[in-house]
Amino acid sequence: LVPVALAEFDAVLGARPNQVDRLREEVDVAAAELLDVGVPGGEVTAEGVQMNVSVGLRYLESWLRGTGAVAIYNLMEDAATAEISRSQVWQWLRHGRIERDQVVAFEDAELAEAGEGRWDEARALFDEVALSEELDEFLTLPAYELID
């Protein structure tokens, strides 16, 4: 697939490494639009929040045990998926789409069903990267301090 992708990039970019020089004068975007996390016709659902909490916790718990790619709900997931999950939770909280209590309840339910492992550490880490006031650059950065 690399040759196919390169051909498409080359067709648009030519010899240029990027499109930084391509200004779109016809596009006028206000700051409020950049901050709007709404999706036309979409909504934040309890199922979506629960899934993000579950995936975030399950991935972090496995990562803390040294596994970087994890089967979660019959899909192979990695840090990028967990990053999306925790970022969505953080963003939904910041913009008032969900409540912290809802996230905590889903965490409680997830840990109630968990077996042995590093679940308490995973939860503390998820709270740090998803429930904090500031969004950390990447969820594994504070996690490195917890690796044996």
Language model feature labels by segment:
Residues 1-148:
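Non-catalytic helical/linker scaffolds that mediate oligomerization, partner binding
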